[in-house]
Design a protein with these regions (language model features):
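N-terminal anchoring/stem segment of glycosyltransferases
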Residues: 1-47, 54-57, 197-220
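Short alpha-helical segments and helix-capping/turn motifs at coil-helix boundaries
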Residues: 6-7, 48-49, 103-104, 165-167
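A glycosyltransferase accessory/donor-loop signature
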Residues: 13-15, 21-24, 118-220
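Short secondary-structure capping/junction motifs at helix and strand boundaries
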Residues: 16-17, 61-64, 69-70, 127-131
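Short, solvent-exposed polar/charged micro-motifs at secondary-structure junctions
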Residues: 28-34, 98-101, 166-171
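Short, surface-exposed amphipathic charged segments that create phosphate/polyanion-binding patches used
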Residues: 33-39, 101-106, 173-176
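GT-A fold catalytic core of metal-dependent nucleotide-sugar glycosyltransferases
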Residues: 47-96, 120
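Conserved catalytic core of nucleotide-sugar-dependent glycosyltransferases
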Residues: 80-144
Length: 220
């Protein structure tokens, strides 16, 4: 899923993108991350909050879960940065009915669920500079994901089209149209997942482009 997500970002972008994956083993080896994996739904459940530290608290950064698929140029999203805000995200009113999600993990219910699944992070904001290694490794999931470390006025809003929760937002219910799909209820390979074919089409296109590059390299 990570590869398809990255491909979709680059496919639509007119500019070069600096994309890095949060790899938990590497972060642990550098002694930046030491939380036990117990009760985490993914390996990046908490590592996303290391981004300001990794950026040396400079500039802006964007985070998204790896089960995203971008349908438009992310430059449009990045243009929504606002230096008066610490974090900018889609403020979902999302309360899933399912008790179990992907990989048989418990579907934890908490306020502001999925707000942190896509974030524009102002790494230079004073409150963001408080997000240090101790906070990321020791504070509760609710504290981090509900942005309890921020004042409400420091959290900016994004259109939900950029974090379109598949099977939650619906074009046929007047929710508009997606700019970025988020397969939050499970991977896009799940049988009843809306937009499954869209994801598979991007995967196929990625594989075709990769094969074309390999063929070109061999022919030289």
């Amino acid at each position: 899923a990570s590869k398809v997500c990255e491909f979709s970002l680059r496919h639509h972008s007119k500019e070069d993108l600096d994309i890095s994956l949060l790899k938990t083993p590497a972060l642990k080896k550098k002694k930046l991350y030491w939380r036990p994996y117990k009760n985490q739904s993914t390996q990046f459940t908490y590592t996303r909050f290391l981004i300001p530290y990794l950026q040396k608290y400079k500039g802006w950064a964007m985070y998204c879960d790896n089960d995203f698929l971008f349908l438009n140029d992310v430059k449009e999203l990045l243009s929504l940065q606002n230096n008066s805000k610490a974090v900018i995200c889609v403020k979902h009113e999302y309360k899933p009915k399912e008790k179990i999600k992907m990989d048989n993990k418990k579907q934890t219910q908490f306020e502001r669920k999925n707000w942190s699944s896509l974030m524009l992070i102002n790494c230079e904001h004073p409150d963001v500079k408080d997000v240090d290694l101790s906070m990321v490794n020791e504070e509760s999931g609710e504290y981090l994901h509900q942005f309890d470390w921020l004042n409400d006025e420091d959290i900016g809003s994004l259109p939900h089209s950029w974090n379109w929760l598949v099977n939650w937002y619906r074009t046929d219910k007047g929710d508009g149209h997606p700019d970025a799909l988020h397969f939050t209820e499970g991977g896009p390979w799940i049988a009843d997942s809306e937009y499954k074919q869209t994801w598979l089409n991007y995967k196929k296109l990625m594989e075709e482009e990769n094969e074309s590059k390999r063929t070109t390299t061999i022919s030289r």
